[in-house]
Amino acid sequence: KLRRLSGCAAKPVAALGERRQRSSAPGLAGQRPAARHAGSSPAAAAAATARAVVDERPDLLLLAGIAGVYPASEVAVGEVVAVAEERVEGLPERYADVYRPTFAVPGLRTAVSNSVARSGAAPAGAEVENMEGAAFFAVAAALGVPAAEVRAVSNRVGEPFGVWRVADACEALARELALLVGEIGSVSSQDRLPLRRSAGGVGKG
């Protein structure tokens, strides 16, 4: 059973597997995910993710939230995507980590995402942007918890906030999460991607 979330607003939600101590099963089948607001900034997301891992001891971490889509992208407003790569925008190349999911999210189009400090940064090959993804992945990697990210597109990058379709994006996200919790629960340990840090960032082995 998925706990009801009190509004999506602009705050991503980290959905967590049940505490490890209660089950040694590799997936989430038969377990109740926990959900927490992860905040609307890199610092808030990092703190919330770390706190959730300490409190819940999850098998998996799934970050869910809204995103803006860059004009050249084929991703539509209202669509939900699985983030295939999360980049830290604005850092010098030598410091620019790239993060990739460490378990599979089935059934969604994938997209490359920029983690930005402000909206409107150059896409540099990314299709969507958000603020929290890289911080979330960095904490998950440091603590050794498999992690993935999904985003519902609420706006085109550069649009004023007044025209963002936040409610529509949150509804689409809630529908997908209800399906994903069951599907992710059937993922076997053989389907998990190894968690490691490399010169290109954190991601697939």
Question: Where are each of the predicted segments found?
Answer:
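N-terminal beta1-alpha1 ligand-phosphate binding loop
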Residues: 1-27
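Glycine-rich phosphate- or other oxyanion-binding loops that anchor nucleotides, phosphorylated ligands
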Residues: 27-194
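Short, intrinsically disordered C-terminal tails of secreted or membrane-associated proteins
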Residues: 200-203
